[in-house]
Amino acid sequence: MQAVRHVVCALSGGVDSAVAALLLRRRGYQVTGVFMKNWDSLDEHGVCTADKDCEDAYRVCQILDIPFHQVSYVKEYWNDVFSDFLNEYEKGRTPNPDIVCNKHIKFSCFFHYAVDNLGADAIATGHYARTSLEDEEVFEQKHIKKPEGLFRNRFEVRNAVKLLQAADSFKGQTFFLSQVFSQDALRRTIFPLGGLTKEFVKKIAAENRLHHVLQKKESMGMCFIGKRNFEHFLLQYLQPRPGHFISIEDNKVLGTHKGWFLYTLGQRANIGGLREPWYVVEKDSVKGDVFVAPRTDHPALYRDLLRTSRVHWIAEEPPAVLVRDKMMECHFRFRHQMALVPCVLTLNQDGTVWVTAVQAVRALATGQFAVFYKGDECLGSGKILRLGPSAYTLQKGQCGAEVATESPTDSPEDGPGLSPLL
């Protein structure tokens, strides 16, 4: 008789992870619920919902009659996620801590805790995503040695597991999983909600006494900020660096700000005394000035070229067609739930890529992740380190005057005018 499979499910205190645990129980697995505490609310005077979330996760386990564990990754989160968050903002970039958290905390720390401490055969989360493995295939996976060197040997990991988009395309969360490095973790992960819609998940919760999580507002934004003012929060950790708001059209000074790193491209600039809204289109890291333009559709907000850091490829590193041709057509997005944009990737020798979008996109920003897709498959992602000239710059013929948008320590393989080396 085959032993009952043990699945350790990450519980956030929300409806998605609660229903994920419920569905695992229905499949006959031995399920253990684990709540991860990643931020110490005692560090701040602001509001943090971690304690309430933990209580809700514990109550889920009581309703489902499964064991409950709580584990603290406060130190790891600070070192690997929050410190990176601050460093990126200090460089004037716009980081995505959710992507970094999944990479370092959920699919590294939590995965190893579940396997090594709780004896899990597999882990599960409430993410809306799928893999190329069925449940039984997940349980048949053996430990794979961590790859060495710049790229994984494509013959070392046969039939690598693929990360696939969820049935609910609007709720799909492969974007946030695009930096999960460990094939070992991914091939031993179950996503019970991958084939379901959010509305159906809510229906399941309502029919199974999970009303306390069903009624909660969906968590948005960063857990460590809560309801606090973002600018005030950031200035608790970073020194103010006052500068000017300058019109991109005539170089007129329109106002002052407390730090160029507080703004991301596409964001509305809060400039007192102006009737119409102005939007951030450039940042000068040397002088500390923020360039702004009127109208939300100003051409200075649109670009069709960017360069990433070395891309993390999930299943095939890098894809064979990209290695062979040095170019590859696919789609990308740099914000969750934005429409996929057709693009062409150009591979550099150091594993970075140039991304040329078929059409200019609004509000590209360094520090964000460009996440690549081919059909239903999420191929991986790379951090945006450099932007090409805006449509406004090209219209004025000022390509050479483009404001630097990355740290000098991150110099890319430059082509003329920031064009990819084709």
Curated annotation (Swiss-Prot):
Kindly state which reaction or reactions the protein catalyses. Answer: 5-taurinomethyluridine(34) in tRNA + S-sulfanyl-L-cysteinyl-[protein] + AH2 + ATP = 5-taurinomethyl-2-thiouridine(34) in tRNA + L-cysteinyl-[protein] + A + AMP + diphosphate + H(+)
Among InterPro entries, the record links this protein to: MnmA-like, MnmA-like_C, MnmA-like_central, MnmA-like_central_sf, Rossmann-like_a/b/a_fold
Region annotated Disordered, chain positions:
402-422
GO CC, sorted alphabetically, is: mitochondrion
Site described as Interaction with tRNA, located at 127, 268, 368
Location relative to the cell: Mitochondrion
Q: Where is this region: Interaction with target base in tRNA?
A: 96-98
Q: What EC numbers are recorded for this enzyme?
A: 2.8.1.14
Tell me a Gene Ontology molecular-function term this record carries: ATP binding
Note the PANTHER family from the entry.
Answer: MITOCHONDRIAL TRNA-SPECIFIC 2-THIOURIDYLASE 1 (PTHR11933:SF5), TRNA 5-METHYLAMINOMETHYL-2-THIOURIDYLATE -METHYLTRANSFERASE (PTHR11933)
Q: Which family does it belong to?
A: Belongs to the MnmA/TRMU family.
Q: What is this protein called?
A: Mitochondrial tRNA-specific 2-thiouridylase 1
Taxonomic classification: Eukaryota, Metazoa, Chordata, Craniata, Vertebrata
